[in-house]
Amino acid sequence: MVSMRDLLECGVHFGHQTRRWNPKMKKFIFGERKGIYVIDLQKTLRYFRYTYNIVRDAAAEGKTILFVGTKKQAGGAIKEYAEKCGMPYVNHRWLGGMMTNFGTIRQSIRKLEVIEKMEEDGSIKLLTKKEALMLTRKKEKLLAYLGGIRYMKTQPDMIFVIDTVKEKIAVQEANRLRIPVVAPLDTNCDPDLVTYPIPGNDDAIRSVQLFCQEMAEAINEGKALREQDGEALANEEKEITDEEKKEVLDEAMSEEDFGEEQE
């Protein structure tokens, strides 16, 4: 579990410039130095350890925790640590409705499965070069936006977010659905929007990595406890039909921009 030394070495205590702050974060601020707010690491440590246990217990109950972080400093760590603990993630861009309109998102994921099946069974080779190219492009878009959540069959039970200001739509959707939000809170964030806050820097790469690493460790610890009960989850594959193949091909040939359509 995280230590005070970890927090200091990763710069978790460095907040934003004093002119860029949310007054609601005042209780988490230790002081100010050279125009930068300094976060109270004693409180960070306490909240960190409490939240670690919350996430561990959620994983032990078999719950799904969705990792969300799309900015440059977070994307790599979000993907790396979500995969290390076997959880879904969004690290490219949050598409509006990813949780509140999950049925439509699942339909798009199904299209990805259809294209991959066509590649696997060779039916894509029966198409013209242009048709095959358009399907390949569509697959790349689908993978970029939805690859991290392709195995998420239902809405998540909890979300872990890096930068709640940037990911405000994801946080809003979670709040609307009463899905608990876990997130580091920099000095410009609104703590009222987060169920389990951890005051700390959400911009520095090392700080972001530390948060992601600790959440992944908590989840793996919880999963280990669950495995003691001998429970296993089975993923059932749904057969791809010719009708689905034709539908996805027609859609790809229309040259629709998936990202803009879903935004």
Swiss-Prot record:
Q: Name one GO molecular function term.
A: structural constituent of ribosome
Q: Where is the composition biased (Acidic residues)?
A: 250-263
Q: Which Gene3D superfamilies does the UniProt record give?
A: Glucose-6-phosphate isomerase like protein, domain 1, Helix hairpin bin
Q: Answer yes or no on keyword Ribosomal protein.
A: yes
Tell me which CDD domains the record gives.
RPS2
Q: One Pfam family, short name please?
A: Ribosomal_S2
State the coiled-coil residue ranges: none
Question: Which residues fall in a compositionally biased region of kind Basic and acidic residues?
Answer: 223-249
One GO term (biological process): translation
Keyword Protein biosynthesis tagged: no
A GO cellular component annotation here is: cytosolic small ribosomal subunit
Q: Segment Disordered: which positions?
A: 223-263
List the keywords (alphabetical). Ribonucleoprotein, Ribosomal protein
* HAMAP family registered for this protein in UniProt: Ribosomal_uS2_B
In which family does this protein belong, per the annotation? Belongs to the universal ribosomal protein uS2 family.
Cited NCBIfam families: rpsB_bact
**Protein name per the record:** Small ribosomal subunit protein uS2
Q: Which organism is it from?
A: Campylobacter jejuni subsp. jejuni serotype O:23/36 (strain 81-176)
